[in-house]
């Protein structure tokens, strides 16, 4: 099965769907919002062509469920807030927003939410229906999505750490896994494996920057957030917990060792230095803001499905309940690609073991996602300088 067919979140609205298990990402969006507002402010002040008529925006790797429209809401509110503060003709410009993800993404779950979303925008922001136009643009963001110099602002949250393919060179000349017992580029991976993953990320991210710089108008902005490398004090990350669970299944004879050794996640968590270096070497963008932040991976537990704060009793419950929350979120993201390789039947047992590992990590006070946020401005063409 092609990677693009399985690289998506759990769709629908069931118990293991991304729509029901993405409150952690809502907290990440909250962290990003001040930088988003500043990015929008600088964009509107840049007075790009046609920006007073229609601001063209895209969310790359938008996923599905309510978080997709939370991102849209934050972008629209930021544009309206800046327009009101600046008291200019951009107070309520038309906004055209393209939602991008791979073809297997559950766009329908987003479309079902649009009528109520438009009504809410009209009630809370005074935006007439038709002044914010939302549509889908399916396809890989490692390829061309929009005409040249047609976009004002590109946004992506928790997507660019996904690679376009599993790196080559992960199998030795003897046909043996070079990353035996490991499912991604971890600290325990051999140097050649780490280099293979770094090379693939460098190639993909360079392509991403080049292609989307061509789609942006000169002076256009791009805001990216992705998972990045942590430090020793963070303890095991969730992929390490998954890796342990898979290895346990192999040791107990419930899963073939070959299945483990032939599985490599198409995911890379870069360091801040790597991202900075790639942007500078590609050369199309100026870095306006670059920072990292960390959030415990049970932090979103304090937010319920309607993004309301839970009771103190719920927030301060034991680590097993919080581990279940972490497991549902992780499952919503990773189950499609795991099930395509290991089979649907083993998923309940696998995630049960994952939950046990997560509870232990939380009990020890470990468990953080490290994130990187970078704000970019497209450099003017030499002829424009």
From Swiss-Prot:
Keywords: Magnesium, Metal-binding, Methyltransferase, Transferase
Entry's Gene Ontology BP terms: methylation
EC number: 2.1.1.-
Residues reported in the UniProt entry to bind Mg(2+): 179, 261, 263-264
Cell division recorded as keyword: no
Pathway: Alkaloid biosynthesis
Family: Belongs to the methyltransferase superfamily. Type-7 methyltransferase family.
Name under which the protein is recorded: Probable caffeine synthase MTL2
Organism: Coffea canephora
Phylogenetic placement of the source organism: Eukaryota, Viridiplantae, Streptophyta, Embryophyta, Tracheophyta
Gene name per UniProt: MTL2
